[in-house]
Structure formats: structure tokens, C-alpha cells
């Protein structure tokens, strides 16, 4: 799934339909973990969480452990995230789970698909997560909605999840082996919102390039600051592409001017004070548009790559690899996404200056 495919589901109304091969991989991983976990100590299945990982959980309590994890961490505050952010979270979780590393039950995957395709959105507050241990609080609220508790929105109206699911004809999920932990433990919130940010940043850049082209034309600018030769002297793809797009935008213009036909042709005029009556070169803010928007384009593209890499990663702890074992680690950590969002924020500010 690329950015366009992601956005088509979140904003464009396209359906989410996992392939049979993806579902079979997830089923195989869950079946493997169910058998592999017998007689072994595995975090989040028969242990507590975080600093309570040293506490053994009796087999009779393991299912309720998953529910209690979701309910206890659904403690966020602040305004509700918009529906597009919730849908992005649902989709990121679904894509990640289809990699098999979280070993979730089929019911979780069916639930995520049903919520996406019917437009059911659990209520998720914007404050509470820190990213360093995954988006625990936001994803706990997502999980709360998936099990049919809490509140949500459907067709523009907020209500209890039980009423929403009845109206939408959707069933809540039931949590199995480590489903609660899998829903909480990862970067779905920051990754989903990050991909939306990248999409909107591209749109803003398109407008910025169009406005820069318009300014170049209405000010009757010299056109050599956009030349392929000048911008090709810098080895930055973003600058070169911005200049190319601006050249295409003003192609055939009767307002922009060719320097060789005037200042380089001995036609320059000087007033009584010895000052050229024509600008020798364009104002700084005009002739540096490719050098300003080019780095912005490069930054957005790099953010897109990192966010798509995260989308197609397994961001969970533990990691289940069928026929190879279970691995404990820190793939839930969100710095990869967070640093890209810091850079993207600077780029967006630059566009608006």
C-alpha cells in the first residue's frame, strides 16, 4: 500500500479488502503462537505489563488480562481526534497485523475491516500518549471501541459504541491470546496521523508552487532563475523538480522575460542618477523559490518514505515469527516517526512564511 492507496481508503471512500494470502499469514502466525506459548514465559501472555512484567498471570486470568489492559489504559484527555485520524489508526493497525508479527486472532482483523468499511469510529482523545512506549493511550481508546465499549461516531453522530454497532450492523471483537496488547503496543496513532500530514503537506506544496509561478508571471520576472542549467548546478532533486514544475506552469507566458533579449542585448537603460531602470535580477523572494520549496519537497518525500516503512513494519512487542520463535524487544518505539514529523513541521512553517 502506497500513500495514494492509504488516502483513498481514509478520505476517498475506497474499501479495505485484505488478500487471502495476507489473512492466511496472520492466521498461521496466531496458530503458531498459540502452540508455541504453552509452557513458556512470554511477555503479555502470561505476565503483567511494564514494570509488572515479573508478575506471573494464572492461565484462568489470561483472557481478562487483555480486556483489563485496554480498559485501564483508556485514560486520555482533551478534544476528540477527528474521524479521519481514527480511520488512519484503524488502517495502520490492520496493515501491520497482516504482517503476522503480532499474531492476532482473525476476529481482530475482521473487526478492523468492518469498522473501516462501515465508517464506525471509536472516540479517541488527543492527549495521553508519549510515543516512547507506543501510542498506548490513544490505541487503548481504539481498542475500547473495538470491544464495543466507550463512545464513538457513526454517520456524523456521537453515541455509545453499543448503539453505534447496533445501527451499523457490526459486532464488537472478542480479545484472544494477546490481542489487547497488540492493539495498544505500537505506533498506529502517530503513523496514521503522520501519513495524513504528509498528504496535506503535498497539497500545500502544490499550492505554493502554483502561487510562486503566478508571482513570477505577474511581476514580469526574468526567467533564468528557473532555468534547467542554473538549478541543475545544485544536486538536489527537490530544487530541480520545483524549478521544472514552475517552468511548465509559465511556459508560453507573454509576461515573463528572457534576459538575453534585453539586458544581454545592450538594451538596458540608465536614469539620470546612473541607476538601471530595470531590475538587474529578481527580488530575492522570487528568484529563490526553487531553493526554498525544493528542500520542502525533499523533506516531505523523506517523511513519506519513513512513514510508509513504518506502516509496513511490525511495531509490536513481542514479535512472533512462525517456525522461528518469539522475540522480545522495542519495535513499539516511535522516534523514527517523531523525528520525521519534527522535520515536516519545519518544512510546513517554511512554506507559510
Regions found by a protein language model. Give the residues of each.
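Conserved, well-structured ligand/cofactor-binding cores
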Residues: 1-353
Amino acid at each position: 500500500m502506497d500513500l495514494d492507496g492509504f488516502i483513498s481508503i481514509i478520505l476517498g471512500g475506497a474499501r479495505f479488502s485484505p488478500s487471502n494470502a495476507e489473512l492466511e499469514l496472520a492466521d498461521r502466525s496466531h496458530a503458531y503462537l498459540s502452540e508455541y506459548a504453552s509452557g513458556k514465559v512470554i511477555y503479555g501472555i502470561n505476565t503483567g505489563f511494564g514494570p509488572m512484567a515479573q508478575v506471573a498471570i494464572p492461565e484462568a486470568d489470561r483472557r481478562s488480562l487483555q480486556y483489563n489492559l485496554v480498559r485501564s489504559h483508556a485514560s486520555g484527555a482533551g478534544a476528540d481526534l477527528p474521524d479521519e485520524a481514527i480511520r488512519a489508526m484503524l488502517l495502520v493497525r490492520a496493515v501491520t497485523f497482516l504482517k503476522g508479527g503480532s499474531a492476532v486472532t482473525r476476529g481482530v482483523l475482521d473487526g478492523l475491516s468492518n469498522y473501516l468499511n462501515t465508517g464506525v469510529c471509536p472516540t479517541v482523545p488527543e492527549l495521553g500518549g508519549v510515543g516512547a512506549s507506543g501510542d498506548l493511550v490513544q490505541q487503548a481508546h481504539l481498542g475500547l471501541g473495538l470491544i464495543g465499549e466507550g463512545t464513538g461516531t457513526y454517520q456524523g453522530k456521537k453515541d455509545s459504541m453499543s448503539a453505534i454497532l447496533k445501527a451499523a450492523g457490526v459486532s464488537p471483537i472478542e480479545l484472544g491470546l494477546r490481542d489487547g496488547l497488540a492493539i495498544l503496543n505500537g505506533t498506529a496513532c502517530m503513523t496514521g496521523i503522520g501519513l495524513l500530514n504528509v498528504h496535506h503537506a503535498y497539497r500545500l506544496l502544490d499550492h505554493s508552487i502554483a502561487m510562486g509561478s503566478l508571482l513570477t508571471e505577474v511581476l514580469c520576472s526574468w526567467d533564468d532563475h528557473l532555468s534547467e542549467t542554473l538549478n541543475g548546478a545544485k544536486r538536489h532533486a527537490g530544487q530541480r523538480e520545483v524549478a521544472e514544475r514552475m517552468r511548465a506552469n509559465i511556459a508560453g507566458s507573454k509576461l515573463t522575460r528572457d534576459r538575453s533579449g534585453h539586458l544581454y542585448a545592450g538594451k538596458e537603460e540608465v536614469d539620470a542618477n546612473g541607476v538601471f531602470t530595470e531590475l538587474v535580477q529578481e527580488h530575492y523572494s522570487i528568484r529563490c523559490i526553487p531553493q526554498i520549496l525544493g528542500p520542502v519537497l525533499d523533506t516531505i518525500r523523506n517523511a513519506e518514505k519513513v512513514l510508509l516503512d513504518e506502516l509496513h513494519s511490525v511495531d509490536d512487542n513481542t514479535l512472533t515469527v512462525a517456525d522461528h520463535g518469539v522475540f522480545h524487544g522495542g519495535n513499539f518505539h516511535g522516534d523514527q516517526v517523531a523525528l520525521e514529523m519534527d522535520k515536516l513541521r519545519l518544512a510546513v512553517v517554511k512554506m507559510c512564511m
